[in-house]
Amino acid sequence: MEAFLEEAKASSRVLAGISGADKNRILKEMAQALRASTAEILKANALDMEDADRNDLTPALKDRLLLDESRVEGMAVAVEEIAALKEPVGRVLDGWVTEDGLKIEKVSVPIGVIGIIYESRPNVTSDTAALSFKSSNVCVLKGGKEAQHSNEAIAKVLRAVLKKNGLPEALISLIPDASREGVAKLIKMDKYVDLIVPRGGEGLIRYVSENASVPVVKHDKGQCHTYIDEDANVENAIRIAINAKVQRPGVCNAMETLLVDTAIAKEVLPLLKEAFDAAHTELKGCGETQEIIEVAPATEVDFDTEYLANILNIRVVDGVEGAIDHIVRYGSGHSEAIITENITTAEAFLNGIDAAVVYVNASTRFTDGGAFGFGAEVGISTNKLHARGPMGIEGLTTYKFKIYGSGQIR
């Protein structure tokens, strides 16, 4: 592991000499190479899917793992979108002249070597490799064993493009050890790795956070809520709630708990139940919810659970303050939404919720680097330092100060 990471670290010096135009050209070549290698990538993914069936992976994990022609095309498009982004490094973020006549520039620079630990999403391999290359970082990829064949096939395609352009293949490094022991080694290698971004289940993220000596940017879990206010447009509220839960329930920006203002609960809950029943959603509710519609009881544990499945908690709350109180207690700081036509209430929610992303009249499913216009994302951070929310190109940079003098001493 150490020799592997030492090679990755050494390769980072090459990136300083690559122009933005050359990086963009190479990224476009990577996108075309992914398209040209679709058959090989899908063949590798089929092996992973066979293993998934044998190992009884959950439907949510299988959905994340599965690749088809459209998803490979989506990977290629994401790489092209990353190529089209503004050059993130070498930008002068601020500048001034001191009383001593020193000219100071605050300039964006790459972080260095970024370790990405992820589970069952093969597209993370191409997304994070492209984002890292665009931002002049080396990426060290540690995928889960359930996607090992797919990750190896994708990384092979990208590394071949690097080699063709005379660049070290170590700029995109895939750790061959897909075991938990491999994670344990990687997160201690602060001599070679500058940042760790874990993407996966709550257990993985907690393990990395508690054991890493390398700085970590993470989200704990996607405990997302939608609050339907008494001044909501009911038709919009139902559409948004269905999308937030049902469109793709196995992802971190899917809603897990729906909060409904007591003032409109009797009107809107029967309509919501009809819509969720049609979507085959398993509903659990608080006592007041159970008095209005027929649902299973929701426990305190349920309100603290990230289901990643088509299961939804419902709680009736006393206005926006009741919604905020619930989210403060159970939220994970990921994404929260209010549905209301009342601007004052909306602002109270926006200002009262401490989360990476807070919505008014929109689905939490938009918390995504692509949806934000970032091209793709390395992950979604609930940290408050360095990066927060969908972590795109800018989250992969830091800064340094360049100071120009003319002989000044102190």
Curated annotation (Swiss-Prot):
InterPro entries: Ald_DH/histidinol_DH, Ald_DH_C, Ald_DH_N, Aldehyde_DH_dom, G-glutamylP_reductase_CS, Glu-5-SA_DH, GPR_dom. GO terms for biological process: L-proline biosynthetic process. GO terms for molecular function: glutamate-5-semialdehyde dehydrogenase activity; NADP binding. Pathway: Amino-acid biosynthesis; L-proline biosynthesis; L-glutamate 5-semialdehyde from L-glutamate: step 2/2. It is found in: Cytoplasm. Its EC number is 1.2.1.41. Its main location: cytoplasm. Keywords: Amino-acid biosynthesis, Cytoplasm, NADP, Oxidoreductase, Proline biosynthesis. The keyword Oxidoreductase applies. It catalyses: L-glutamate 5-semialdehyde + phosphate + NADP(+) = L-glutamyl 5-phosphate + NADPH + H(+). One of its GO terms (cellular component) is cytoplasm. It comes from the Bacteria. Disulfide bonds: none annotated. Catalyzes the NADPH-dependent reduction of L-glutamate 5-phosphate into L-glutamate 5-semialdehyde and phosphate. The product spontaneously undergoes cyclization to form 1-pyrroline-5-carboxylate. PANTHER family: DELTA-1-PYRROLINE-5-CARBOXYLATE SYNTHASE, GLUTAMATE SEMIALDEHYDE DEHYDROGENASE. Belongs to the gamma-glutamyl phosphate reductase family. HAMAP family: ProA. This is Gamma-glutamyl phosphate reductase.
